[in-house]
Amino acid sequence: MIKRLEISSPKIKTDKKLLLISDIHKNKNHKKDNLIKLKEEIKNEFKYIDYILISGDLIDTPKDLVDEEFIKELKYYLEEFTEGKKTYIALGNHDIDGNNIEEEYLYNILKEIKNIKCLNNTETINIRDISIQGFTPNIDYYRKHHGNKNEYKIQFEEHKTEKNDKNKYNILITHDPSSIIELNMENKEIINKNIDLVISGHMHNGLVPQKLQKIMNHKGFVGPYKKVLPKYAYGIIKINETNFIILGAVNSMIKMPVVNKLYGYDATILTLKKVK
C-alpha cells in the first residue's frame, strides 16, 4: 500500500516530495521482492520525488555481505531503484547484527554508491530549508535493552550532530520508534533538539493487516522481539511539536506468498508544503 501524507510548516520554503521506505530485508535467497512492485506502482510519480529516506533494515543479515555476488547485487538493486535520486539511510538492527561483521562494513559498501548517503551518528545534511540526520543505537540496545527508553536516551544524548537550526525543517531518521516517542511524551526538551519530523520503521505495522489499521489506531498485535500489543506500530503521530511517521515494511521477514498477500508492501509519499 502506498500512503500519501502532507505536512505543512512555515519552515518549508518550497514544496518537496519525499519517498519514505523501511524494512526492505534484502537477502541473497530471495530474488523477487516487493521493492520492484512498489517501484512499478509509483512509476508515474517517481520523477517528482526529490529525496528518498530509508529508515533501516536494508538487508536481512550482514552475514550475506561475505558473498561478493550479493554485494554486487545489492549495489545494482539500490542503483536501479533510486535512479540517481539523493537517498539517505539510517541503519536498523538487521543491518548491524552480524556477530563478527561490523556495522561499518555495510556503511562502507553504501559509500561506494554515489547518490546514497548512509548517515552515521555524527552527520547533518543541510539542504536549503531542511536538514536530515540519522541515529542508530548500537547493537546492545537491540540485544539487551530493546524498548528501554533510558538506555536509548543515554545513547541519543551522545548523538554528536551539530545543533539543529530552529529555522530549518529538521528531520531525523531512526529505526526503532518506541523509545523516542515515549521520551518525547515525557519531556519534549530531552529528545526534541528542534526535531520537526522523525522517520522510523522496525514495527512491521505490528502485524496488523492494512484493512484493520484504522480500527487499531496505531496499536499493533505483535511487535519486534515478540512484544505483545505495542502502542505505536504504524501511522503518523504528533507529540508536542514533533511528527512521528512509523513506516511498515517493504518486505515481510516471513517469505511466504500467503503472508505477502495479507500484509503487502508499505511505503509513504510525503509532501512537505510551505504555508501559504
Q: Predicted segments — roles?
A:
Residues 1-75:
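N-terminal active-site segment of His-dependent metallophosphoesterases
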Residues 8-19, 115-116, 123-134, 164-171, ...:
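Beta-strand-turn-beta hairpins that frame and shape the catalytic cleft
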Residues 178-267:
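Conserved beta-sheet core of the metallophosphoesterase superfamily
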